[in-house]
């Protein structure tokens, strides 16, 4: 883990975009748990709002970031297509390729079922805002643990490998 500290969100996002734009750092595929409806929209909107649309479009090697709407259970969600980068949401892959229904599709539940591991507990905080403002170190560890759980799910299940094989065969 490469942890960097910044005094402002502007500096953080500028540094991230500068790092991302280095060709060897730009991914061909991004993944995460519910990344299509949470992580990517959050990142795109924060970059757009804090440092501007021009730099937000640099997330795409082609300068093409488009907004789309999807409806789940009648509720509208915004998602973004980042041209030149495939988004393989591990939650979607799990639902598509594991032919069994689960009582919950939260990462914590699926990690327990598949890996016998759980997310880092943060129940001592009343709200998520309290968590990241009053327990910063644990908040960082919580996010790292989430990434590790998705990585371990892929190590075990090979769903990204399967999706890529199906796409290119």
Positions of PLM-derived features:
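A conserved hydrophobic secondary-structure block that centers on an alpha-helix together
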Residues: 1-45, 49-54, 133-142
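Conserved "right-hand" nucleotidyltransferase catalytic core of DNA-directed polymerases
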Residues: 59-60, 64-169
């Amino acid at each position: 883990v490469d942890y960097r500290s910044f005094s402002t969100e502007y500096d953080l996002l500028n540094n991230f975009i500068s790092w991302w734009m280095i060709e060897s750092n730009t991914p061909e595929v991004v993944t995460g748990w519910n990344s299509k409806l949470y992580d990517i929209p959050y990142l795109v909107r924060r970059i757009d709002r804090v440092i501007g649309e021009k730099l937000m479009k640099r997330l795409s090697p082609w300068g093409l970031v488009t907004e789309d709407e999807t409806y789940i259970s009648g509720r509208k969600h915004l998602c973004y297509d980042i041209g030149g980068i495939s988004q393989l949401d591990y939650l979607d892959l799990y639902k598509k390729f594991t032919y069994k229904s689960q009582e919950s599709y939260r990462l914590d539940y699926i990690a327990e079922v598949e890996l016998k591991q759980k997310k880092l507990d943060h129940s001592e905080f009343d709200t998520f805002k309290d968590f990241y403002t009053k327990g910063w170190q644990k908040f960082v560890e919580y996010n790292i643990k989430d990434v590790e759980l998705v990585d371990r799910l892929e190590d075990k299940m090979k769903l990204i490998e399967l999706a890529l094989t199906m796409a290119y065969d």
